[in-house]
Amino acid sequence: MAGEDNVEVVRRGLEAFNRGDIDAILALLDADVEVYSDPDTGNTGTYHGHRGFIDWTRLWLDAWEEFRIEVREVEAIDDEHLIAITDQTGRGRGSGIEVEQKGVAYAFTVRGGRAVFMGLYFTRENALADLQARR
């Protein structure tokens, strides 16, 4: 049951991101959440806590006039580890160039109804490998 509940936590968080509802997102993130971006993605590095999440998000969104995440699937690896496969679309700020990235993966560790870890990767394989290394 915990895995199913955590799938819903991840879905609600990604939906809140698309709405721009930062309060709803923060309510689903542990106060000490670790946010990680794989070296192949933007905003590479590790960010900590709600402030870190906000900084990470702002750095990413500053590059885009429009940006949206479409969730294809949220997969429970076990009771607390999940991977969301998404398609991302956006239009660059200034350039106006439209970009579409398919199959972008987010990894999550969710405990007590809140994400304690969130990672961004270009592939499911990279997300899964990182989750396994963090266990």
Spans of features found by a protein language model:
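Short, aromatic-enriched amphipathic alpha-helices that serve as compact interaction elements
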Residues: G3-D21, L28
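Generic alpha-helical secondary structure signal
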Residues: E4, E8, D23, R51, ...
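A solvent-exposed, acidic/Ser-Thr-rich amphipathic alpha-helical stretch
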Residues: A24-E80
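A general boundary/transition motif marking the beginning of the first structured unit of a protein
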Residues: M1-A2, G13, T44-H48
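A beta-strand edge to alpha-helix "cap/lid" segment located at domain peripheries
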Residues: M1-D5, R58-R135
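Generic anion/oxyanion-binding catalytic loop in active/binding sites
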Residues: L14, G42, V116
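Residue-level detector of alpha-helix boundaries and kinks
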Residues: V10, D38-G42, R93
